[in-house]
Each structure stands twice: as structure tokens, then as C-alpha cells.
Amino acid sequence: MKTKITLLFLIIGLYAFSQKDNYALLKEHSKTKILYDQVFELSKITKEKKTEISAMYFRQVYHEIQRADYLQRLPKYEELKKVADNAFFEKQIPLSILLSEVETIKTEAFENNSISKNSNNQYVINSNELVFDVHEIALMAPLISKSKKQDIKFILRENQIFNTTNRVISELSIRINENEMWQTIQINQSFSLHFNGNGKQPIYFKISFTDGSTKYINSTIDILGNASENNQSALAQTITATIPFQGFGESQAYFGQGEYEIYLDNVNQVLDKPIFLLDGFDPGDTRNADLIYSLLNYGNSGDNLGDIVRDEGFDIIVLNFPQYSPEEVIIIDGGADFIQRNAMVFVELINQINALKVGTEKNVVIGPSMGGLISRYALRYMEMNNLNHDTRLYLSFDSPHLGANVPIGFQHLFNYMANGPLGDVTLQDVVSSVISSSAAKQMLIDHYLGHLQAGSQTEFNNAIQLPTGAPNFRNAFQNELNSMGFPQDTRNVAISNGSSNGMMIGTPGMFVLNDYTVNASATQRAKIDVRFTPPAGVSNQLVSRFRAQQNIIIWITVFSSQANAASPSTSSGLDSAPGGMFNVGDFAAGGSGNPTLDDFLANLEIDRFCFIPTLSSLAITNSNWYVNVDDTSITPFAATYVPTANEDHVTLSDGNVEFALNEILNEPLSVEQPILSETFLIKNPIKNMIEMYSSNLLSNATISIIDASGKKVFTQNNISINGNHQLNVNLSNGFYFIKIESTERSFIMKLIKN
């Protein structure tokens, strides 16, 4: 009976994990003075021993310990974040150490009534039994998770060594290869290390103490890549726009900056046939020029569209939008900045390349993803302002001309976990640098900022359930883009990664997570629900719910948040619409190392969502996002490539590469129709016969085969192709192009003989 009364008292009196007054009377019983139960343990530091300590994991643990410490011995997390942010200006990566002992309440302490609550809703100890488990924590890591350089300068400052224990450090050592000798770290003195590889690279730390004990800690850093020996660029330059742009919320206009590299052709090594390739949405500048160039990879054989056109005499100019500082303490993240400012950078690059190039060949522009919007805006801006872009072809590659989509359920969930009571610092970075970036607010059709209650940073207004863009960003940008239209002096073509036949990604309203439980500790857990936006005409459907619960004999929900959504009568929700797909895990990559986030990402019912709707990538206006795309669809593009199945965003395939090559290498006919993937097919590889299929009549066709050196090795004239067609050839093994020129249409495709 006593237990039941105590339990009822607990249920009535329990408010939230964050109410530290509840734990105030336990302070005198705590030896470490850090009681972890005061915070929600997202890091699971007291449950699991991580073998690799990433920068974001270190920062999350620091944030939890800082808040759980009765004595408040550690600076606020914001101070640690400021040190990390200053690394951009200091050009060196700070290291940090965290040594601590923390306590958690034993589960049985509640069950045997060793701990209960008094009349003031405060926990009290009722016995002399041990009620706490003690956990030792020793972490060391860089405060920055990635670097674009292989030669990195590090520094460990004295004020970045956080130690709440009585242990005294005698020596600190580092190495990046287990076979190397240890290198002593001198406090407050910078030192450099060279990493031989790219990707995730190990860093090994050794902490020696005066008592003779030693701690070995493994950490990591991501090296974002460098130029390969086989693909060196001729130029690597910084470029600054000459036209400034002032975005909403900015106190002044800034000149945008970019980085460009020129990959000269493999024929004459002369800059005379430029193809511009622009980077897309890239918060944090995770791609350098070589990684952007690698976006042109396709298939399983290592083929690259850029390599193919360079063999044909074209030069590739890659434009990256890096992080930069236009003035003191201001950092602009170019990969997620205002589209207009990046467009002004591209305008300047076009002007400079036009002045440099030899001959009269006009430019080609390839704009993947957001790069398609940047290039569209820039080309049209130049036309409207009497600036000669000297461009003949604009190729949009799965670009969101009518907006992009990230499920509003995930937006709500991530924002609540980041900026609500949990204080998840790993997701804070995802929300601030990705979802809340200027570019995302311009592009996302449905944005969490459009749903928030007045004065709240996390809670949704249930009266706003239909898709709503970010205030002052989304509608303003789309209206400007619509009023400008498309470039008028170029041939405009588009590749979509979304299906043409209405194929869905999952189903509207489906559960992505259904009452999924994430166990943070023996006494703490989270219950998570996420759903895709609902079918047409359905309202008040739950799309996200987070419940934090504490175990006091039974599980009690102590704080929660929920978002509901509706779909218009004309179309089901965007999350499952046909379109270029994105992986939820990749979207939340900035939160990597967060065990709670990793848990539920590993248990999703579906791990992809519609990112760029098919209609958006083709600029087709229709109130139903699920409508089929065919020859009757009205699009501003002269030609389009649309697959029959949804593909990952900015995926190159044999089909769309053939489409791109046909557009780049051939002069267009006077009248073009949108080209779907089934229009013309060739079976690869071949032996002594070429098997081809055309769904439409190709009359008076001339078929030519060109080898890798550009030599024409086969020609046949006056051929009609309608349906299946076979052609006997005698070719040596190798790589070729086959060119079909007919009265109706022309193609150029890759051919492999083996």
C-alpha cells in the first residue's frame, strides 16, 4: 500500500528531467557532484563504451556533463562551440580533453523505496544503501569533425582541458598510425600532422597520469579529399562577385565568393570549349572540386561523364561555393547561402572564362540540384542586364524549380530534439546549418518555421497544417524566380531523377517509425513516432511525436511534443510523391555519433523520401504532385529525360548520360520533344552485332561509330529504325560512340565492345 501511495505521489509531482530542483537534495549524497539523471542521456555515455570519439560525440557528452554538474565547474556549452567556430579564423583545429566521474541512480533504488519524493516534489534518500552507480569518463577529440586539407594544424590549449576529478595529467601524446612512435603534445603550442588518406582518418591519443595509469582514446577526423594524380586541374582560383547581394535578415550586402578549378580537355589542353559544372546544396562545404567532379561518375565501371566530354575536346570548369568570411566574425556558408548571391559569383566566373577562352565555341552549363537554380538565375540575370553569357546549352539536373521537400515530420522531430529540453548538440548543427540555412528556407516547400507557435522555438501551431514555406524566404524567392523565367538565349534541357509514371516512394501517411523506443539509460527512454504526410484531403494527421519518459516503477512521460499535418484535396503529401530520392541518414549526417539518433535511423520502415518532386525538376505546374509525365506535359524545357523508376537525387545512369551527351555533342534540331528513357535503347556491351530499339520511327538515318581517338570507324546511310533493329559490325574491343542522325531526331550514345 505504501508503494502505491508513493507511486501516485511521484506521478502527480513529476514535471520534467530538466527541473533540477527535483534533484537538489541528492547533491549532498553525491560523491562526484555530477548526477546524470538530471539530463536526458542522448550520448549513452554511462551505458555504452564507444570505440571512436568523434568531435560531435565529445561535444554532446560535454553538454550533458556541464548541465548535470551540481557545482557548474565547466563553462557553458556555448563557450566550447565558440572555440570550435573560431577554428575557421585561426586556421587550426582545437583539441579538447574531458575527464570526469558521474553518477546515475540505480534502478532498484526506486523499486525498494530507497529514493522517493517529498512534499516539495524533491527526491530524497530514505536508507543508507548505495543508490548511485559511478561511471568514469575519459574523452579526447578534435572539436572540428572535418578538414579539406591533409596537412592539419592542431592545438591543445590549457583552457580546453576539463577535469572534474582528482587525477593529474603528466603527459599527452598523439599519433595517426598505430605503427608510429608517439608524439608528445605541448600544451598551448600548435603542431601539424599529415594524413595520407581521405575519408574518415584515425587519431590516437594517450593520456598519462601521475599515478602511473594511462588512458588510450581513439578519435577520428574526416578528410574531404584532394586532387588525384590522374585528374589534376590546370587552375585553382578564388573568385569574388562584383555584384553584391543582401539577403533577408542581413544588415548589409556582401560580395559572394567561390572557388573554381579548370580541368582542361584531353585533346589539345586549350581552354576553348567550356562546360561549367556547379556545386549544389552543400552545407559546411563538404565537397571540394574533385568531389564535385566525381558527381559525374556513373555505372559500375568507373565511367565519368566529365572524362568522356574531355576526350571530345571539352573543358570542365567546376565552381564550388565554400565557407568564407567577408568581414570580421562573419562566416558565410556558401554551400547553403542565398541562391542569388551564389548566382552573382557564377556571373563573374562566366565573364572571366569568356575573356580567357580561345575561339568562338559557346559555353555549356550543367547545374545539379541547387546548382541548377543558381545557374538558371545567373544566366537569366545576365540576359536581363545586357551581359553576354555566350552560352548555348543549359542542362538542369534534378533541380527544384518549383521547390524541394524534406518531410515535415523529421523537421519537427530534429528541431525539437535539438532546441527543446533535450539539447541535442549534434542535431543542433543539422538544424542550424542544414534545415535553417538560407538556401533551405528558399527552396523547401514545407518548412518547420512556417508552423511554429508565436514565441516558440519548437512547438507547432495546430491551425497551420498545410505545407507552408519559411516566412520571408520561400515565397519571395519563388516569386522572383517565376517572374524572371528561364534563360531565353540558351537551349534549356532537364534531367529528372523522379519517375514519369507516378511511382510512389512508400505511401502517403505511412509510419516511418511507429511508437519506436530508444532506451537512453535504465531510467530514461524516448518514444518516437514519424509518419509521411497524409493522403489528399486528410487533415490533423500526426506526422511527428517525441515523448521523453522516466522509469519510476512505471514509465512516465515527462515532456513531449507533437506535430500534425494536412494535405490539400488536390494531392497527397510530398513525402511519398514521385521524385529524386534522399536518404534520411544522409540528411542527418551532421548528427553522426549520436547513439540515440543512430538507433532510430537504423530502424526506419523506409529510409528514403521524395526530395525533388518530378514535377519540380521539370518545372511542370500541376496541383497534383503525383500526375504522370508524358509528351502532353507542358514544361519550359526543350527536351527532358525522365526515368520510369525513382532514383536517388543527382544519380547519373547510362540513360541520362546518353541524353546529356546527345545534348552536349550534337547541334539541336529545330523542333524537339521531351525524351523519356524508353525512346531509344542500345544493348551494351556488344560483340559483333549492335541491338537497338526505337519506340518511334527514325527515317533516313545515318549511323556512325567513332572510336576513343575521335576517328570514324563505321558509317551506314539511309536506314529506317522502328522497333527492334540489328546492325552487324566488326570492331576491336574498346570504347566507342555511336551517332544516329535521322530526319526526326539525333542521338549519340556510348558503345562498349568486348
Where are the regions that the model predicts?
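Short, surface-exposed "cap/lid" segments of acyl-processing enzymes
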Residues: E250-F321, S325
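Catalytic nucleophile-loop/oxyanion-hole region of alpha/beta-hydrolase
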Residues: P326-V345
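Extracellular/lumenal mature domains of secreted and surface-exposed proteins
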Residues: Q19-G249, E663-P668
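Bacterial Sec-dependent N-terminal signal peptides
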Residues: M1-D21, V671, F735-F737, I748
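Loop/turn elements at helix/coil->beta-strand transitions in domains of secreted/extracellular proteins
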Residues: V270-I275, F281, D311-I317, V358-N363, ...
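C-terminal outer-membrane/trafficking sorting elements
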Residues: P674-N754
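Serine-dependent carboxylesterase/thioesterase catalytic core
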Residues: A343-P467, Q478, S500-S544
